[in-house]
Regions:
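Bacterial N-terminal signal peptides
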Residues: 9-21
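Sec/Tat signal peptide C-region and signal peptidase I cleavage site
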Residues: 22-26
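Beta-propeller domains
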Residues: 57-83
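Peripheral, non-catalytic segments that deliver or gate enzyme domains
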Residues: 40-41, 63-68, 84-90, 96-391, ...
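Active-site-proximal cap/loop segments of hydrolase catalytic domains
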Residues: 442-650
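Cap/lid segment of the alpha/beta-hydrolase catalytic domain
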Residues: 365-492, 497, 526-536
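Beta-strand-rich domains and repeat architectures in extracellular enzymes and scaffolds
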Residues: 35-66, 335-337
Length: 650
């Protein structure tokens, strides 16, 4: 893309935009085309080969479909090694031998992922898990066993995943460890033997850390985390006699600790932060030593545990602005791929060489973003009406005063997830169109301790929704938001919150955009995939037992309150969504239309829980852009149905 062509395109987009005031037009930067912000990245997710000589990364083919490419470090010999022509590839890893790449792919968004092996010698591709209706997950590899991988498959029983050991040269798969019926994840020791797992108690929702001393030895329960605690397994220590776990027992936040593999006794606290839970742990792939861990309250921070790496993280922190993430490392740990995320620019990827502490840029995720002005994201802490501190992020349009702006409350999914600081294509798209964007880590968001998490138990449509209302009022009271022009928007749980916001606080919002959001909690849980079975008790504890308590379900499900909606609604849905069945969206739309309420509905026949294909993504967001401009008054790039999209207007 040339600079001249890009500027001409921006000028055309700005000239054709919906009418805005002369003052606003003069102050705001030109419209950034939707396909720059919301289309496929130019290049992303570089992963270094085990020997440190090559990187594999994702980039579009000449047909615009994301595929895996390989490049020799220091050369320009980039070669596409996969040949997907439809949904694109998003998950891949190197085999430890360096001879193969492994990638995951489903069909039409059904999330029954198959694991494929690409032979980098002859280019052949083999489906390693060629079983109809079976999902591959929990892939494990180990440098000491370069010709193998372990993978979980629900082949024997659709509700649970047994672990299979696959020979990557022949494709032969053998059952390694059978699931007794309650295990949700597995892990190996330094000898690549499955010796630990986490299981769910279906009676009380507790989580169990289970271990065994060898492959032929019986399993035994080591640690039990009650449902009100947070706990997770990170991995074995190198000697196999202790394990690293994250646990909130004895504290509010989850600490990273080491426990005895024989007794479960806590041996030492490795790292903790009083503000937030421990995050990603960084292990040496060859020695299995724990070397660093992240914490993220408002921004990502690294706590270095291996003194020999302190100078490396110091060098990375000084080399480039933004928050740094370590994406991959070679076997000897000498070369890394890293990513720098800033709030107002593209993601920068680089290779870091510990020898000389040299950082060599690779590419950015979208070069066109280097030529435009993006908006800044500010971390703010908002206090709810009952005193909870909610880490939130406010982004206001570049070139405009942050006063009386139309605002989009962008609600994250999960709800057991969180928003983070850094580049966000959806946020930048909205800000470029003239909207302030508010992202709130409401109660039940993860990473802020067990009290904050469990304050959201049974509070869908209750205090969780109040948190969002309080955040909007915060923005209004500070003069940032125009109270007449507030929208609520989100996907998955964020879609539910959109429906709940319009139904339960109809006076607050001018419009809403719901993407794959559930409208009836009972029917949502009735239609979940069979492999969610081990999570069912946890879902009841956190959401409420909507199967037994029909009055509670009617209270919190927007479907039963469709008559209260007053603001226009746009709904986007994937026809094959395995998590939120299409009936959730169709039911809400029909309930609103039966009452003569304004709703637009678009279904994409080859999508699941979200819009993976760029044609569908650009089609939906083009419709959403016009919808928001109509009801909030922001700018919009002209829209016509996108060629190749499978939109079905209903």
């Amino acid at each position: 893309m040339t600079r001249r062509w890009f500027r001409a395109r921006l000028a055309l987009a700005a000239a054709l935009a919906l009418t805005v005031t002369p003052a606003a037009r003069a102050a705001q930067p030109p419209l950034i085309p939707r396909d720059v912000l919301l289309g496929n990245p130019s290049k992303t997710q570089p992963r270094i080969s085990p020997d440190g000589t090559r990187i594999a990364y994702l980039a579009p083919s000449d047909k615009g479909v994301l595929n895996v490419w390989v490049r020799t470090i220091g050369a320009n010999d980039d070669k596409m090694v996969t040949a997907d022509n439809h949904r694109g590839i998003r998950q891949f890893l190197w085999a430890e031998s360096g001879k193969h790449l492994i990638y995951l792919q489903d069909v039409g968004g059904n999330e029954n992922f198959h694991a494929y092996r690409v032979d980098l010698g002859d280019g052949s591709v083999k489906d390693l898990t060629p079983f109809e209706g079976v999902r591959a997950q929990n892939i494990l590899t180990d440098p000491g066993h370069p010709g193998e991988m372990l993978v979980g498959l629900n082949r024997r029983d659709k509700k649970i995943f047994d672990m299979y050991r696959i020979n990557l040269d022949t494709g032969e798969a053998k059952l390694d460890t059978e699931n007794p019926g309650d295990v949700s994840s597995w892990d190996t020791d330094a000898d690549f033997v499955i010796r630990a797992c986490t299981a769910a108690n279906p009676e009380d929702g507790s989580q169990i850390l289970r271990v065994r001393d060898a492959a032929e030895q019986p399993w035994r329960d080591l640690v039990t985390w009650p449902a009100e605690e947070n706990g997770d397994l990170e991995g074995f220590a190198p000697d196999g006699q202790s394990l690293y776990v994250e646990t909130s027992v004895g504290a509010d936040v989850a600490r990273l600790v080491r426990v005895d593999a024989a007794t479960g006794k806590e041996l030492e606290t490795i790292a903790s932060d009083p503000r937030c839970d421990a995050g990603d742990a960084l292990f040496n792939r060859t020695t299995h030593r724990l070397e660093a861990v992240t914490f993220n309250y408002t921004r990502r921070e690294w706590k270095v545990l291996d003194p020999s790496l302190k100078a490396d993280f110091d060098a990375l922190g000084k080399a480039h602005p933004g928050d740094v993430d370590v994406l991959s490392r070679d076997h000897d740990g000498g070369k890394w791929t890293v990513a720098y995320s800033v709030d107002d620019g593209p993601v920068q990827f680089a290779v870091y060489n510990r020898s000389g502490r040299a950082l060599t840029p690779l590419f950015v995720n979208q070069p066109a973003l280097e030529k435009v002005q993006l908006a800044k994201m500010a971390a703010v802490v908002i206090t709810s009406r009952d005193g909870l501190k909610m880490v939130s992020y406010l982004t206001t349009p570049a070139g405009m005063e942050a006063r009386s702006l139309p605002l989009v409350l962008l609600v994250h999914g999960g709800p057991w997830g969180r928003d983070v600081w850094g580049y966000n294509s959806q946020v930048q798209w909205l800000a470029n169109r003239g909207y302030a964007v508010l992202q709130v880590n409401f109660r039940a968001s993860t990473g802020f301790g067990k009290k904050f998490l469990h304050a959201g138990d049974r509070q869908w449509g209750g205090t969780m929704q109040n948190d969002l209302t309080d955040a909007v009022q915060w923005a209004i009271q500070r003069g940032v938001a125009d109270p007449r022009h507030i929208a609520i928007m989100g996907g998955s749980y964020g879609g539910y919150a959109t429906l709940a916001g319009l139904a339960f606080t109809p006076q607050l919002y001018a419009c809403g955009v719901d993407i794959v959001g559930p409208s009836n909690l009972k029917t949502l849980l009735e239609a979940t995939p069979p492999y969610w079975a081990t999570m069912r008790k946890m879902l009841y504890l956190r959401m409420g037992d909507v199967d037994k308590d029909s009055l509670f379900n009617r209270k919190v499900s927007p479907y039963f309150h469709a008559d209260q909606v007053r603001a226009p609604l746009l709904v986007g849905q994937g026809a094959n969504d395995p998590r939120v069945n299409i009936r959730e969206s169709t039911g809400m739309v029909e309930a609103m239309r039966a009452r003569g309420l304004p709703v637009e509905y678009v279904v994409y026949k080859d999508e699941g829980h979200g819009f993976a294909r760029p044609e569908n993504r650009l089609d939906f967001y083009g419709r959403a852009e016009g919808f928001l401009a109509k009801y909030l008054g922001g700018r919009a790039e002209p829209f016509a149905a996108v060629e190749g999209a499978t939109a079905d207007l209903r």
